Amino acid sequence: MRALFPGRFQPFHKGHLAVVKWSLERVDELVIVVGSAQESHTLQNPMTAGERVLAIRRALEDEGIDLRKVYIIPVPDILMNSAWVAHVRTYVPPFEAVVTRNPLVKVLFEEAGYEVLEPPPFGREKYVATNIRALMALGDPKWEEMVPRAVAEIIKELGIIRRMRELSKRD
């Protein structure tokens, strides 16, 4: 079975990594959908889709995950929830299930006839991308504890912290 795992991954954190591992214990292949692919260079979406793809791929490689079982595909947003599942389907290989804890995503895919696999919360209270981005914008190194080592390296290598600090400045 092939399953879809959608998210913005701004940034890809240890909770996301745990969901990927959990999913690959249950499905043959996993399609990681990098959502809001058109968004970047904002405090809410600091990384480009390509930067997120690179960070996710390096994190999975670093963890020894077989990349032959994983697709990482950027998908831009549309502003119509009722058409979103069909929109996503145009970007990804066929799939039978979706991995999510998001109530809206769950409803949309269930209504479209897909099986929903709901992973455990995996440190949901600790691994919150909004909090990670806030720490990054402040220059607080604690954010590094919340993301896979490879993701922290990519973020530093690409200058994402500097980008966020600049974006957080006031006129």
UniProtKB/Swiss-Prot annotation:
Top enzyme category: transferase
Iron found in the keyword field: no
Main subcellular location of this protein, as a coarse class: cytoplasm
Record localization: Cytoplasm
Database matches in InterPro entries: Cyt_trans-like, NMN_Atrans_arc, Rossmann-like_a/b/a_fold
Pathway(s) annotated for this protein in UniProt: Cofactor biosynthesis; NAD(+) biosynthesis; NAD(+) from nicotinamide D-ribonucleotide: step 1/1
Protein family membership: Belongs to the archaeal NMN adenylyltransferase family.
Protein name as it appears in the record: Nicotinamide-nucleotide adenylyltransferase
Organism annotation: Ignicoccus hospitalis (strain KIN4/I / DSM 18386 / JCM 14125)
Lineage: Archaea, Thermoproteota, Thermoprotei, Desulfurococcales, Desulfurococcaceae
